[in-house]
A protein has these predicted regions:
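Short, Lys/Arg-enriched N-terminal segments with co-localized hydrophobic residues
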Residues: 1-16
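Hydrophobic or amphipathic, alpha-helical segments that drive membrane association/targeting
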Residues: 17-188
Length: 188
């Protein structure tokens, strides 16, 4: 029992003090570079929005529809910035405060074997990030899209779509990940 507690305490210390080895540093840098490129592209999109209908579209679109499309594009871009800042912050906080190590310690205690532990780890991380993005998804679907008249989704349809999506992810993604984990475990 004492050895079990020492092992748990040691694993717990590692969870909350992640080391930034070369690979982890490269991953964080790549993540930040990609986020900044996406952010820059969004800013360029916002900068290039024009309040007047271009001459080329006169007679094809009316001014009201054009202004609505520009307002929608602006709202989408602004929402995307807020959403991506939130996602990036949650991911980096989870990483730097040892969230991945904590989840690993949690699922390792369950005794599911290597493949089951790997699937449990990925499933819990997926669940956590889905839950953290859920408020943004709900706002996007039921507030932002509704404001511009694009939302045809009912709450019931939304829930059914979410269930279908997660079932497909679990079956297809889980099957592929299980196969990869099994191959890694089987190859000497």
């Amino acid at each position: 029992r004492k050895n079990h507690l020492v092992a748990f305490a040691s694993r717990r210390e590692r969870c909350f003090m992640p080391e930034l080895n070369l690979l982890a540093t490269l991953l964080v840098v790549a993540l930040l570079v990609l986020w900044n490129l996406d952010f820059l592209a969004t800013l360029l999109t916002l900068k290039n929005l024009k309040p007047e209908l271009p001459e080329e579209f006169r007679g094809v679109w009316d001014d009201e529809k054009y202004l609505k499309s520009q307002s929608y594009e602006k709202a989408q871009a602004q929402f995307g910035i807020v959403s991506s800042i939130s996602s990036l912050t949650i991911l980096l906080a989870f990483w730097f405060f040892g969230g991945f190590g904590w989840v690993d310690g949690l699922v390792s205690e369950l005794g599911f074997g290597k493949v089951g532990t790997g699937l449990s780890f990925i499933g819990l991380v997926y669940l956590g990030f889905w839950l953290s993005s859920l408020p943004f998804d709900l706002y996007h679907t039921f507030v932002l899209e509704e404001r511009f008249g694009f939302n045809k989704t009912t709450v019931k349809t939304y829930i059914i779509d979410q269930i279908k999506s997660h079932l497909l992810t679990a079956i297809l993604g889980g099957g592929i990940v299980a196969l990869i984990l099994w191959i890694f475990d089987s190859v000497p």
